[in-house]
């Protein structure tokens, strides 16, 4: 499990334990379904997002299930609590024209501009997570054959094709990049250190403004756009799932809903009875 996920689950349990302590409960077996329901209700009152509350309940379920299996707890209480209803939120997606404007925003006459353009091109070409992008090593990319090897969530390795535009952008960047023998990462800051997720997030926000893109944009939006545009042009859902590194095709199916939404808008705009 990823470190960020572990930290989130730990934080969920600490928060619930603090609530139980305030209620005078001395151990986990004193917790009843109503305790959990009241806690989740209080979290809503604190304006916690529905997705956050749902994750907190999942954390409790995992904890109790493990405790019961290990004989440390008597009852699996959280399984009696109904999950919050999550609204289906479609991913933010750029149009192909917006992607073109975004990828053209970096200044190709500067080293940082060449780096940023290569990162943007690669992100859109492969649908990588930004955490995977910044960790890429030079040995992970085969520019001659046009593919890369990436280690994603759960230490699962996958092979992803890389298009000619992204390959050329990477070549242009590497031709001007100052060599830092100690660094194997592809994308380095001007100080010779690996680019960070936050650093790149700030850069993409800057380029979105320069490209006059009004949507709320993040590196993940390019991942969403990669998947949606593939499906819109007829790509097989299972192939897209493999390239994204999704363990279940159900996760990938959300992009078909985006496609249907796009079709509905097109029909409404252009059909005489739309």
Task: Name the predicted role of every residue range.
Residues 1-274:
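Conserved catalytic core of the tyrosine transesterase superfamily
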